[in-house]
From Swiss-Prot:
Visual pigments such as rhodopsin and porphyropsin are light-absorbing molecules that mediate vision. Rhodopsin consists of an apoprotein, opsin, covalently linked to 11-cis-retinal. This receptor is coupled to the activation of phospholipase C. Porphyropsin consists of opsin covalently linked to 11-cis 3,4-didehydroretinal. The chain crosses the membrane at residues 37-61, 74-98, 114-133, 153-176, 203-230, 253-276, 285-309. Phosphorylated on some or all of the serine and threonine residues present in the C-terminal region. This is Rhodopsin, deep-sea form. It is a multi-pass membrane protein. It comes from the Eukaryota. Residues 1-36, 99-113, 177-202, 277-284 are extracellular.
Length: 352
Protein backbone atom coordinates (compact mmCIF):
# COMPACT_ATOMS: atom_id res chain seq x y z
CA UNK A 1 0.00 0.00 0.00
CA UNK A 2 1.27 3.47 -0.92
CA UNK A 3 -0.64 5.17 1.87
CA UNK A 4 -1.17 4.89 5.60
CA UNK A 5 -4.57 3.81 6.88
CA UNK A 6 -5.61 4.47 10.46
CA UNK A 7 -8.83 3.65 12.33
CA UNK A 8 -10.46 6.89 11.13
CA UNK A 9 -8.18 8.34 8.46
CA UNK A 10 -6.18 7.59 5.32
CA UNK A 11 -3.05 9.56 4.46
CA UNK A 12 -1.63 9.28 0.91
CA UNK A 13 1.92 8.61 2.10
CA UNK A 14 3.68 5.44 3.18
CA UNK A 15 4.79 5.41 6.80
CA UNK A 16 8.12 3.68 6.08
CA UNK A 17 9.97 6.69 7.46
CA UNK A 18 7.71 6.90 10.51
CA UNK A 19 6.72 10.55 9.96
CA UNK A 20 3.00 9.98 9.34
CA UNK A 21 0.77 11.07 12.21
CA UNK A 22 -2.99 11.23 12.83
CA UNK A 23 -4.56 14.26 11.05
CA UNK A 24 -6.69 14.79 14.16
CA UNK A 25 -3.67 15.28 16.44
CA UNK A 26 -0.62 16.60 14.57
CA UNK A 27 0.16 19.18 11.84
CA UNK A 28 0.50 17.52 8.44
CA UNK A 29 3.42 19.60 7.19
CA UNK A 30 5.14 16.49 5.86
CA UNK A 31 2.43 16.42 3.15
CA UNK A 32 2.89 20.02 2.03
CA UNK A 33 4.81 23.12 3.08
CA UNK A 34 3.22 25.41 5.72
CA UNK A 35 2.75 28.14 3.10
CA UNK A 36 0.47 25.79 1.12
CA UNK A 37 -1.84 25.53 4.14
CA UNK A 38 -1.78 29.32 4.47
CA UNK A 39 -2.85 29.69 0.83
CA UNK A 40 -5.61 27.15 1.46
CA UNK A 41 -6.88 29.16 4.46
CA UNK A 42 -6.77 32.41 2.46
CA UNK A 43 -8.68 30.81 -0.42
CA UNK A 44 -11.42 29.50 1.87
CA UNK A 45 -11.66 32.86 3.65
CA UNK A 46 -12.15 34.51 0.25
CA UNK A 47 -14.98 32.08 -0.52
CA UNK A 48 -16.63 33.04 2.78
CA UNK A 49 -16.30 36.77 2.02
CA UNK A 50 -17.94 36.24 -1.37
CA UNK A 51 -20.27 33.34 -0.65
CA UNK A 52 -22.11 34.63 2.41
CA UNK A 53 -23.10 38.11 1.13
CA UNK A 54 -24.19 37.00 -2.32
CA UNK A 55 -26.28 34.06 -1.07
CA UNK A 56 -27.77 36.02 1.83
CA UNK A 57 -28.63 38.85 -0.57
CA UNK A 58 -30.37 36.37 -2.87
CA UNK A 59 -32.56 35.20 0.02
CA UNK A 60 -33.25 38.69 1.36
CA UNK A 61 -34.14 40.26 -1.99
CA UNK A 62 -36.52 37.44 -2.89
CA UNK A 63 -38.28 37.67 0.49
CA UNK A 64 -38.40 41.48 0.26
CA UNK A 65 -40.00 41.60 -3.21
CA UNK A 66 -43.28 39.73 -3.59
CA UNK A 67 -43.08 39.60 -7.39
CA UNK A 68 -39.99 37.40 -7.10
CA UNK A 69 -41.82 34.70 -5.14
CA UNK A 70 -42.56 32.51 -8.16
CA UNK A 71 -42.42 28.69 -8.19
CA UNK A 72 -39.18 28.76 -10.19
CA UNK A 73 -37.54 31.05 -7.64
CA UNK A 74 -38.34 28.62 -4.81
CA UNK A 75 -35.78 26.26 -6.31
CA UNK A 76 -33.26 29.05 -6.79
CA UNK A 77 -33.73 30.03 -3.13
CA UNK A 78 -33.10 26.40 -2.24
CA UNK A 79 -29.73 26.68 -3.98
CA UNK A 80 -28.88 29.74 -1.89
CA UNK A 81 -29.78 27.91 1.34
CA UNK A 82 -27.63 24.95 0.28
CA UNK A 83 -24.72 27.29 -0.40
CA UNK A 84 -25.07 28.88 3.04
CA UNK A 85 -24.92 25.39 4.58
CA UNK A 86 -21.61 24.90 2.81
CA UNK A 87 -20.31 28.32 3.89
CA UNK A 88 -21.14 27.92 7.59
CA UNK A 89 -20.80 24.16 7.91
CA UNK A 90 -17.71 23.67 5.81
CA UNK A 91 -15.82 26.79 4.80
CA UNK A 92 -15.47 28.32 8.27
CA UNK A 93 -14.08 25.11 9.78
CA UNK A 94 -11.66 24.63 6.88
CA UNK A 95 -10.21 28.12 7.35
CA UNK A 96 -9.45 27.32 10.98
CA UNK A 97 -8.06 23.84 10.35
CA UNK A 98 -5.87 25.04 7.46
CA UNK A 99 -4.34 27.68 9.71
CA UNK A 100 -3.34 24.89 12.12
CA UNK A 101 -2.23 22.42 9.46
CA UNK A 102 -4.49 19.56 10.58
CA UNK A 103 -8.13 18.81 11.42
CA UNK A 104 -8.27 20.16 14.96
CA UNK A 105 -11.98 19.44 15.53
CA UNK A 106 -11.58 15.68 15.83
CA UNK A 107 -13.79 12.91 14.47
CA UNK A 108 -17.08 14.57 15.46
CA UNK A 109 -16.11 17.79 13.72
CA UNK A 110 -15.03 15.81 10.67
CA UNK A 111 -18.41 14.10 10.50
CA UNK A 112 -20.25 17.42 10.73
CA UNK A 113 -18.05 19.14 8.16
CA UNK A 114 -18.29 16.21 5.76
CA UNK A 115 -22.06 16.06 6.21
CA UNK A 116 -22.68 19.75 5.52
CA UNK A 117 -20.33 19.81 2.53
CA UNK A 118 -21.96 16.72 1.01
CA UNK A 119 -25.47 17.97 1.82
CA UNK A 120 -24.86 21.34 0.18
CA UNK A 121 -23.40 19.82 -2.97
CA UNK A 122 -26.20 17.27 -3.30
CA UNK A 123 -28.96 19.82 -2.71
CA UNK A 124 -27.43 21.91 -5.49
CA UNK A 125 -27.30 18.93 -7.86
CA UNK A 126 -30.87 17.78 -7.20
CA UNK A 127 -32.13 21.38 -7.39
CA UNK A 128 -30.64 21.56 -10.88
CA UNK A 129 -32.50 18.33 -11.69
CA UNK A 130 -35.78 19.92 -10.58
CA UNK A 131 -34.98 23.06 -12.60
CA UNK A 132 -34.22 20.93 -15.67
CA UNK A 133 -37.54 19.08 -15.32
CA UNK A 134 -39.36 22.41 -14.82
CA UNK A 135 -37.79 23.82 -18.00
CA UNK A 136 -38.66 20.65 -19.90
CA UNK A 137 -42.30 20.78 -18.76
CA UNK A 138 -42.68 24.52 -19.47
CA UNK A 139 -40.92 24.70 -22.82
CA UNK A 140 -41.42 21.23 -24.31
CA UNK A 141 -45.02 20.82 -23.06
CA UNK A 142 -45.07 17.00 -22.69
CA UNK A 143 -48.33 17.42 -20.71
CA UNK A 144 -50.40 20.05 -22.46
CA UNK A 145 -52.74 20.83 -19.54
CA UNK A 146 -50.11 20.75 -16.81
CA UNK A 147 -49.33 23.92 -14.86
CA UNK A 148 -46.16 24.13 -12.77
CA UNK A 149 -47.35 25.86 -9.61
CA UNK A 150 -46.46 26.49 -5.99
CA UNK A 151 -47.36 22.99 -4.80
CA UNK A 152 -45.12 21.40 -7.41
CA UNK A 153 -42.27 23.70 -6.39
CA UNK A 154 -42.68 22.76 -2.72
CA UNK A 155 -42.69 19.07 -3.63
CA UNK A 156 -39.54 19.72 -5.65
CA UNK A 157 -37.89 21.31 -2.60
CA UNK A 158 -38.82 18.36 -0.40
CA UNK A 159 -37.48 15.98 -3.04
CA UNK A 160 -34.07 17.73 -3.15
CA UNK A 161 -33.67 17.52 0.64
CA UNK A 162 -34.73 13.88 0.81
CA UNK A 163 -32.31 12.87 -1.94
CA UNK A 164 -29.47 14.98 -0.52
CA UNK A 165 -29.87 13.49 2.95
CA UNK A 166 -30.05 9.97 1.51
CA UNK A 167 -26.49 10.62 0.34
CA UNK A 168 -25.09 12.72 3.20
CA UNK A 169 -26.50 10.86 6.23
CA UNK A 170 -25.47 7.18 5.74
CA UNK A 171 -21.78 7.83 6.60
CA UNK A 172 -22.96 9.17 9.96
CA UNK A 173 -24.71 5.88 10.75
CA UNK A 174 -22.19 3.26 9.71
CA UNK A 175 -22.54 2.97 5.92
CA UNK A 176 -19.18 4.38 4.78
CA UNK A 177 -17.54 7.17 6.78
CA UNK A 178 -16.26 10.74 6.59
CA UNK A 179 -12.48 11.15 6.83
CA UNK A 180 -9.97 13.98 6.25
CA UNK A 181 -8.97 14.18 2.59
CA UNK A 182 -6.21 15.73 0.52
CA UNK A 183 -4.05 17.85 2.79
CA UNK A 184 -6.15 16.58 5.72
CA UNK A 185 -7.84 19.91 6.55
CA UNK A 186 -11.32 19.15 5.24
CA UNK A 187 -13.48 16.03 5.33
CA UNK A 188 -15.41 14.06 2.76
CA UNK A 189 -16.65 10.57 1.94
CA UNK A 190 -13.96 7.87 2.11
CA UNK A 191 -13.04 7.13 -1.52
CA UNK A 192 -9.58 5.93 -0.52
CA UNK A 193 -10.27 2.56 1.11
CA UNK A 194 -12.68 -0.36 0.70
CA UNK A 195 -13.18 -0.50 4.49
CA UNK A 196 -15.41 -3.63 4.64
CA UNK A 197 -16.31 -2.89 8.28
CA UNK A 198 -18.54 -0.04 7.08
CA UNK A 199 -19.37 -1.49 3.62
CA UNK A 200 -17.55 1.42 2.04
CA UNK A 201 -17.33 -0.08 -1.45
CA UNK A 202 -21.10 -0.49 -1.83
CA UNK A 203 -21.76 3.07 -0.62
CA UNK A 204 -19.33 4.67 -3.06
CA UNK A 205 -20.88 2.72 -5.95
CA UNK A 206 -24.38 3.70 -4.74
CA UNK A 207 -23.31 7.34 -4.48
CA UNK A 208 -21.83 7.50 -7.97
CA UNK A 209 -24.81 5.78 -9.60
CA UNK A 210 -27.78 7.27 -7.72
CA UNK A 211 -26.37 10.66 -6.75
CA UNK A 212 -24.21 11.50 -9.75
CA UNK A 213 -24.93 9.43 -12.87
CA UNK A 214 -28.74 9.39 -12.54
CA UNK A 215 -29.18 13.17 -12.00
CA UNK A 216 -26.77 13.96 -14.83
CA UNK A 217 -28.69 11.61 -17.13
CA UNK A 218 -31.98 13.34 -16.26
CA UNK A 219 -30.45 16.77 -16.82
CA UNK A 220 -28.95 15.68 -20.16
CA UNK A 221 -32.28 14.25 -21.35
CA UNK A 222 -34.27 17.35 -20.36
CA UNK A 223 -31.92 19.80 -22.02
CA UNK A 224 -31.49 17.60 -25.07
CA UNK A 225 -35.25 17.75 -25.60
CA UNK A 226 -35.25 21.43 -24.69
CA UNK A 227 -32.78 22.38 -27.42
CA UNK A 228 -34.81 20.54 -30.05
CA UNK A 229 -38.09 22.13 -28.93
CA UNK A 230 -36.69 25.67 -28.82
CA UNK A 231 -35.35 25.28 -32.36
CA UNK A 232 -38.67 23.94 -33.62
CA UNK A 233 -40.65 26.71 -31.90
CA UNK A 234 -38.36 29.38 -33.34
CA UNK A 235 -38.78 27.94 -36.82
CA UNK A 236 -42.57 27.68 -36.58
CA UNK A 237 -43.11 30.87 -34.51
CA UNK A 238 -45.59 29.03 -32.27
CA UNK A 239 -45.21 31.49 -29.38
CA UNK A 240 -45.20 35.28 -29.28
CA UNK A 241 -41.81 36.93 -29.61
CA UNK A 242 -41.96 38.30 -26.03
CA UNK A 243 -42.80 34.90 -24.53
CA UNK A 244 -40.06 33.20 -26.52
CA UNK A 245 -37.55 35.81 -25.35
CA UNK A 246 -38.55 35.37 -21.70
CA UNK A 247 -38.35 31.58 -21.91
CA UNK A 248 -34.97 31.77 -23.65
CA UNK A 249 -33.65 34.05 -20.90
CA UNK A 250 -34.62 31.67 -18.11
CA UNK A 251 -33.51 28.60 -20.05
CA UNK A 252 -30.12 30.15 -20.77
CA UNK A 253 -29.69 30.99 -17.08
CA UNK A 254 -30.46 27.43 -15.96
CA UNK A 255 -28.25 25.87 -18.65
CA UNK A 256 -25.32 28.05 -17.57
CA UNK A 257 -25.92 27.00 -13.95
CA UNK A 258 -25.72 23.35 -14.99
CA UNK A 259 -22.54 23.90 -17.02
CA UNK A 260 -20.93 25.77 -14.12
CA UNK A 261 -21.89 22.96 -11.74
CA UNK A 262 -20.28 20.39 -14.04
CA UNK A 263 -17.11 22.47 -14.40
CA UNK A 264 -16.80 22.65 -10.61
CA UNK A 265 -17.80 19.12 -9.61
CA UNK A 266 -16.85 16.77 -12.47
CA UNK A 267 -13.07 17.11 -11.80
CA UNK A 268 -13.64 16.24 -8.13
CA UNK A 269 -15.92 13.30 -8.97
CA UNK A 270 -13.49 12.04 -11.63
CA UNK A 271 -10.49 12.14 -9.28
CA UNK A 272 -12.51 10.49 -6.50
CA UNK A 273 -13.62 7.69 -8.84
CA UNK A 274 -10.04 7.21 -10.08
CA UNK A 275 -8.74 6.88 -6.52
CA UNK A 276 -11.54 4.48 -5.61
CA UNK A 277 -10.96 2.24 -8.64
CA UNK A 278 -7.16 2.30 -8.30
CA UNK A 279 -6.76 1.25 -4.69
CA UNK A 280 -3.14 1.39 -3.55
CA UNK A 281 -1.99 3.62 -6.41
CA UNK A 282 0.43 6.44 -5.71
CA UNK A 283 -0.96 9.99 -5.61
CA UNK A 284 -0.02 13.12 -3.73
CA UNK A 285 -2.26 15.08 -1.34
CA UNK A 286 -2.54 17.94 -3.83
CA UNK A 287 -4.05 15.51 -6.38
CA UNK A 288 -7.27 15.41 -4.34
CA UNK A 289 -7.00 18.81 -2.66
CA UNK A 290 -7.12 20.96 -5.80
CA UNK A 291 -10.36 19.53 -7.33
CA UNK A 292 -11.93 19.32 -3.86
CA UNK A 293 -11.43 22.98 -3.08
CA UNK A 294 -12.23 24.03 -6.64
CA UNK A 295 -15.60 22.30 -6.21
CA UNK A 296 -16.29 24.40 -3.12
CA UNK A 297 -16.37 27.53 -5.30
CA UNK A 298 -19.77 26.32 -6.53
CA UNK A 299 -21.28 28.12 -3.51
CA UNK A 300 -20.62 31.43 -5.27
CA UNK A 301 -21.46 31.04 -8.94
CA UNK A 302 -25.21 30.19 -8.83
CA UNK A 303 -26.37 33.47 -7.25
CA UNK A 304 -23.92 35.41 -9.43
CA UNK A 305 -25.34 33.76 -12.55
CA UNK A 306 -28.86 34.51 -11.32
CA UNK A 307 -28.02 38.16 -10.64
CA UNK A 308 -26.27 38.64 -13.98
CA UNK A 309 -28.79 36.86 -16.22
CA UNK A 310 -32.16 37.56 -14.56
CA UNK A 311 -33.01 41.19 -15.29
CA UNK A 312 -36.02 41.29 -12.95
CA UNK A 313 -34.04 39.98 -9.98
CA UNK A 314 -31.16 42.31 -10.83
CA UNK A 315 -33.50 45.30 -10.82
CA UNK A 316 -34.99 44.27 -7.44
CA UNK A 317 -31.53 43.74 -5.97
CA UNK A 318 -30.34 47.18 -7.06
CA UNK A 319 -33.52 48.74 -5.66
CA UNK A 320 -32.90 47.01 -2.32
CA UNK A 321 -29.25 48.06 -2.15
CA UNK A 322 -30.05 51.69 -3.00
CA UNK A 323 -32.92 52.07 -0.51
CA UNK A 324 -35.82 51.82 -2.94
CA UNK A 325 -34.23 53.61 -5.89
CA UNK A 326 -32.55 52.28 -9.02
CA UNK A 327 -29.91 54.72 -10.33
CA UNK A 328 -29.50 52.49 -13.39
CA UNK A 329 -33.21 52.50 -14.24
CA UNK A 330 -32.72 53.57 -17.84
CA UNK A 331 -30.34 50.71 -18.51
CA UNK A 332 -32.61 48.21 -16.81
CA UNK A 333 -35.72 49.57 -18.50
CA UNK A 334 -34.95 47.98 -21.85
CA UNK A 335 -35.61 44.52 -20.46
CA UNK A 336 -38.56 45.33 -18.19
CA UNK A 337 -41.20 43.94 -20.53
CA UNK A 338 -39.41 40.61 -20.91
CA UNK A 339 -38.87 40.41 -17.16
CA UNK A 340 -42.53 40.93 -16.38
CA UNK A 341 -43.50 38.33 -18.92
CA UNK A 342 -40.95 35.96 -17.41
CA UNK A 343 -42.40 36.31 -13.92
CA UNK A 344 -45.86 35.37 -15.08
CA UNK A 345 -45.24 32.87 -17.86
CA UNK A 346 -42.10 30.82 -17.44
CA UNK A 347 -43.50 28.60 -14.70
CA UNK A 348 -46.82 27.86 -16.33
CA UNK A 349 -47.99 26.04 -19.43
CA UNK A 350 -51.05 26.75 -21.48
CA UNK A 351 -52.67 24.04 -23.58
CA UNK A 352 -50.64 23.23 -26.67
Amino acid sequence: MNGTEGPNFYIPMSNITGVVRSPFEYPQYYLAEPWAYTILAAYMFTLILLGFPVNFLTLYVTIEHKKLRTPLNYILLNLAVANLFMVFGGFTTTVYTSMHGYFVFGETGCNLEGYFATLGGEISLWSLVVLAIERWVVVCKPMSNFRFGENHAIMGLAFTWIMANSCAMPPLFGWSRYIPEGMQCSCGVDYYTLKPEVNNESFVIYMFIVHFSVPLTIISFCYGRLVCTVKEAAAQQQESETTQRAEREVTRMVVIMVIAFLVCWVPYASVAWYIFTHQGSTFGPVFMTVPSFFAKSSAIYNPLIYICLNSQFRNCMITTLFCGKNPFQEEEGASTTASKTEASSVSSVSPA
